[in-house]
Amino acid sequence: MKILIITQYFPPEVAAGANRAYEHAKRWVNLGSEVTVVTCFPNYPTGTIPEKYKGLKFFEEEIDGIRVIRTFTYATPNKGFFRRILAYFSFMFSSVIQSYNKIGKQDVIIASSPPYTIGISGMVLGKLKKIPFVFEVRDLWPESIIQLGQVKNKLIISILEHIELMMYRNAKLIIGISDPFVDFISSKGIDKEKIKIIKNGVNIELFNLKELDIQLKESLCLNDKFVVSYFGTFGLAQGIESIVRTAKILSNEPKIHFLLIGDGADRDKVLALKDELKLDNVSILKPIPKEELVSYYSISDLMLMPLRNLALFNSALPSKMFEIMAMKKPIVHTVDGEARKLLENEGVGRYVEAENPEKLAEAILTITKDSKWLSSAAENGRNLVMNKFNRDFLASEYLEILKRL
């Protein structure tokens, strides 16, 4: 089967969408499919294009058997709504032009959103090439940007919702990432039979158990510390400043240390808040390649999974959650809804009200004294991902759905 994936994010970027596209594509190649990925030059979230690609408008390469076509985008840091919109639309146009000229014959087009402008690329190409268009919805745009307060103009919202509905209607198939997506999308008048769910998962081979990296722990001066970690995006949706304020509350607990690794629109704010509060119990590091991140998981005792207190996140099953469980680390999270139900039912995580540093501090302090829960939560999480959220199984299931189109 010949599969075209259009995605704004792809390795070496480390965004959730980049990982999902790559992990599925690699497995589909191993299962005998020919996979072409049309993406932009890597620049997320810093807006900086690596030296290898600088000055290029087009580049083709092969990554693990995947044909990767990189095309122009307006590279900008993940800051400022209108600059990001320009980045989205520039790639939307360039992806259609390059795909039309370069992809050859394909059996199916998967447009992986967000940003939801990718859906327009897939819809247009599907019509031009007369190829089935599959709309993969990883985030409910424009609902998410409306609830985050990034768009308030009623006319613009109406236009965005009209385009959203047009993409749903024109897609041969819609792929969501959690069960509530079915109800949300079908509430727009879309047949439920057209919507399938392929949840996020984890690469068990990459995120495999690792012995405590004593040398790394020593280099970070974390010996004898209970390390509370967050690895991921420092963005508007995550509310990382709440973690820093939690660290302030626990600053009189010398055994507890916070380790934050990542980048994003709010990174400078987080760094400034740490300095303002004069905290020495918080370490903030720049993004680290996934292959190396495993060592940082090994020195962590508890992982945080924050999202802001917004209704749109009730349907979320963050991909980071599955990496954490694969590494046998217990989770404290602020994600109500689907994630809370899964983690609590499986005895893996504890829920704390979002954007409430006092409650988060209280939960962390309680957990540090509960070695029995820490051990059982770690074991339960590993067993869960091994049995239900292995990328190998999920990719095979996805491919079988595509073959039935």
Walk through the language-model features, giving the residues of each.
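A short helix/loop element that forms part of the nucleotide-sugar donor recognition site in Leloir-type
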Residues: E51-F59, N208-C221
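Short hydrophobic beta-strand element within catalytic cores of glycosyltransferases
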Residues: L302-M305, E323-T334
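Acidic anion/phosphate-binding donor-loop and adjacent secondary structure
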Residues: S186, K192-K194, V202-E218, G239
